[in-house]
Amino acid sequence: MDVLRPQIVTFDGRNYRKNPIQEKQYQHEEDEDFYPDSMEYSDEPCGAYEVAQTPHGFRATVSAPSLLYKHIVGKRGDTKKKIEVETKTSINIPKHGHEGEIVITGQHRNGVVSARTRIDVLLDTFRRRQPFTHFLSFFLNEVEVQERFLMFQEEVLRKCSKDRGVDSTIFQNPKKLHLTIGMLVLLSEQEIQQTCEILQRCKEEFINDISGGRPLEVEMAGIEYMNDDPAMVDVLYAKVHMKDGSNRLQELVDRVLERFQSLGLIVKEWTSVKLHATVMNTLLRKDPNAEGRYNLYTADGKYIFKERESFDGRNILKTFENFYFGSLRLNSIHISQRFTVDSFGNYASCGHVDFS
């Protein structure tokens, strides 16, 4: 790691320097014992914490979903005790299954700040290990598009079914066609509500200006593939663009992405959203409920490898290069929940903002 360019971790809009760590591995250890002696953090945040002075010293609070409490406690309470001893503070964590704030108290302000920083870094570390739970999206499942998609599937199977790896199992469910803006880890109802509020602020600050307070008229037309070799395709997608040829949809989704990245809610992997709708995905071959490259973690956040069999997409790309899937009016950004289905067969929406 370059010490002059350390990893920066963002919490609540503030940036912190994260020093390198050395993890020791022990047989049969669980993740909650993650706090080896060799771990060190820069205890002073780059921004200011809200630390209240009390008659007995100083106090700070940390908001965190109950699912992550165990990582602050550690096995037999070792992690919590270690932080308390080294920072000369007392840390009160809500009981398992109860939502609330983690409260840090101590005689010295620096100690409280140090404990708060260590807890924040631990929370960020283990949040990053959680599987994605939700995603920001546009629904692309209007009736015309579903019908045209089924026509595309029928024609592909009629003309290209003899090509290696091409069969009916790798086509997307037409009711679940969508455009993803970014993936989220939301671990409580409070975090879902906060995400709804952020979307609402986006609407007030720039979505209304970009959309003009009206639905965006778009078309799904043309196909493209994700990887470098058209003879070994894993994901084939339909392209999405504005009917009027403008860049408004791209500008809108990029601004939303930037806002969520700046708040630490979406990992900064890209600076721009690739406008696409997946129509064929080889992960679906063995698991109809698979959700693309994001379906790579178990329920407890452990990485897994999914073997996938690619398909030869050369004939499909040549024959259906400009296939027209239909036009749509995009009027809402949804907070979609993974592995769920609503009454229309789409992903369940936990909240949304409308353009009009």
Curated annotation (Swiss-Prot):
Major site of localization recorded for this protein: nucleus
Residue stretches making up the KH domain: 57-119
InterPro entries in the record: AKAP7-like_phosphoesterase (IPR019510), ASCC1 (IPR009210), KH-I_ASCC1 (IPR047538), KH_dom (IPR004087), KH_dom_type_1 (IPR004088), KH_dom_type_1_sf (IPR036612)
A GO-annotated cellular component: nuclear speck
Tissues expressed in: Expressed in the spinal cord, brain, paraspinal ganglia, thyroid, and submandibular glands.
GO terms, molecular function: RNA binding
Domain of life: Eukaryota
GO biological process, alphabetically ordered: DNA alkylation repair; regulation of DNA-templated transcription
Region of interest (Required for interaction with ASCC3), residue spans: 1-52
Localization annotation: Nucleus; Nucleus speckle
Keyword terms: DNA damage, DNA repair, Nucleus, Transcription, Transcription regulation
Function: Plays a role in DNA damage repair as component of the ASCC complex. Part of the ASC-1 complex that enhances NF-kappa-B, SRF and AP1 transactivation. In cells responding to gastrin-activated paracrine signals, it is involved in the induction of SERPINB2 expression by gastrin. May also play a role in the development of neuromuscular junction.
Subunit structure: Identified in the ASCC complex that contains ASCC1, ASCC2 and ASCC3. Interacts directly with ASCC3. The ASCC complex interacts with ALKBH3. Part of the ASC-1 complex, that contains TRIP4, ASCC1, ASCC2 and ASCC3. Interacts with CSRP1. Interacts with ZCCHC4.
Name the UniProt record assigns to this protein: Activating signal cointegrator 1 complex subunit 1
Species annotation: Mus musculus (Mouse)
